[in-house]
Structures are given as C-alpha cells and as structure tokens.
Curated annotation (Swiss-Prot):
Protein name: Phosphoheptose isomerase
Originating organism: Bradyrhizobium sp. (strain BTAi1 / ATCC BAA-1182)
Pfam families in the cross-refs: SIS_2
Record family assignment: Belongs to the SIS family. GmhA subfamily.
Named cofactor requirement(s): Zn(2+)
GO MF annotations, alphabetized: carbohydrate derivative binding; D-sedoheptulose 7-phosphate isomerase activity; zinc ion binding
Reactions catalysed according to its record: 2 D-sedoheptulose 7-phosphate = D-glycero-alpha-D-manno-heptose 7-phosphate + D-glycero-beta-D-manno-heptose 7-phosphate
EC number: 5.3.1.28
InterPro entries the record matches: GmhA/DiaA, Phosphoheptose_Isoase, SIS_dom, SIS_dom_sf, SIS_GmhA/DiaA_subfam
GO biological process: carbohydrate metabolic process; D-glycero-D-manno-heptose 7-phosphate biosynthetic process
Residues that coordinate or bind Zn(2+): H64, E68, Q175, H183
Enzyme class, first EC level, given as a word: isomerase
Pathway stated in the Swiss-Prot or TrEMBL entry: Carbohydrate biosynthesis; D-glycero-D-manno-heptose 7-phosphate biosynthesis; D-glycero-alpha-D-manno-heptose 7-phosphate and D-glycero-beta-D-manno-heptose 7-phosphate from sedoheptulose 7-phosphate: step 1/1
Function per UniProt: Catalyzes the isomerization of sedoheptulose 7-phosphate in D-glycero-D-manno-heptose 7-phosphate.
Length: 198
C-alpha cells in the first residue's frame, strides 16, 4: 500500500478509537444499554422473542445480533429466540413489490410479532421510513420497542420504549458503536440467562 492509503486507514482507526472512547464514557448510552439488556432478558425469560430490523449496514448488524442470541455469544448455553427480519428475500421482495419498501419490516412485525416480544430497530439516521413503520406496527401489537440511532436520530425516540444514541453523526462510526454496544448487551443478556440455569 502507498503512504496515502496508510494515512487514510490510520486516520479512520484514530477516529474510531476516539468515538469508542466517547461511547465508553457516555453515561446516557451506558444506562440505556443496561435497560435494553434488562428488557430483552425479561422477554426471553418469558418465552418471547427478539425481532431485529435495519437497512444496509444496520441490516448486517441485525443479523449479527440475532446470530449471537440464537447461537451463542461466549458461553455454551441453550438457544434463545431472535430473528433478523432482514434475511427472507422472498418475504422482503414480495412485500416490497406489493406494499412498497417502506412496509417490508412492518408487515413482518404484524405477522410474527406478539405482545411481550421485543423489536430492536436500528437506523443510523433515525429517519428511515421502513424502520419507523416497523416501530409503529410493533407499538400497535404490544411489543417493547428499542431503537439504536446516531446523534441526529433523536426523533425516532418518540416510537421507542428505549433509545440508544451513539455519540456521533458519522455513519460508519455510529455503526461501529452500535455493534460494539450490542456485543456488550449480548454478553449481559447471556450472563443473566445463564444465572437462571445454574
């Protein structure tokens, strides 16, 4: 690689490190993450499930989080119920074709979500229509609603029982904070549910 590429990568890593350091000191984010973990634990203990939605990079995060919950994060333990609503290409394309892309997640929440479940909605901007519609439908159906967003996505909070705000307005950094925080939440969930088994 040439020096310019090295400098770009080093600059990104430095910005990422600074953003993570801010997040680690953000008392509002940490408190919100703890409450989110507790809400998900309550649902899973009751035999309910976690539904997760997001677009683009946030869709990848949705799948990653679901995999940590259904598979395992660190400890060998029973599977817990989590579904990323970003993975069924037939449902996504049928709903998108028949109802419009803005409804690809809301329609799945309507079909799969039941009272007591949790919807985790990830949107770096907090303004994605497909995400906001999913949150509205979840509220109608009695799901607990959780949002992950960035510094400019606070309006999304009106539809969320709990909102985690990454302290950045830069999309890649927001995504990195979301995933790192989600890992902490998964570890907290796993530890709490493993205590039930001991």
């Amino acid at each position: 690689m040439n020096r310019a590429a090295d400098d770009l990568i080093a600059s990104h890593l430095a910005r990422s490190h600074a953003a993570m350091a801010r997040a680690a000191q953000d008392t509002a984010l940490l408190a919100s993450a703890g409450r989110i973990a507790a809400k998900i634990v309550t649902a899973l203990r009751s035999g309910r499930k976690l539904l997760i939605v997001g677009n683009g990079g946030s869709a990848a995060d949705a799948q990653h989080i679901a995999a940590e919950i259904v598979g395992r994060y660190k400890q060998e333990r029973p599977a817990f119920a989590a579904i990323a609503l970003t993975t069924d290409t037939s449902a996504l394309t049928a709903i998108g074709n028949d109802y419009g892309f803005d409804h690809v997640f809301a329609r799945q929440v309507e079909g799969l979500g039941t009272s007591g479940d949790v919807l985790l909605a990830i949107s770096t901007s907090g303004r994605s229509p497909s995400i906001l519609n999913a949150l509205r439908k979840a509220r109608e159906r009695g799901l607990t609603t959780i949002g992950f967003t960035g510094a400019n996505g606070l309006a999304m909070g009106e539809l969320c029982d709990e909102l985690l705000v990454a302290p950045s307005d830069d999309t890649p950094l927001i995504q990195q904070i979301h995933l790192a925080t989600a890992h902490g939440i998964c570890e907290t969930i796993e530890a709490a549910l493993m205590q039930d088994l001991s």
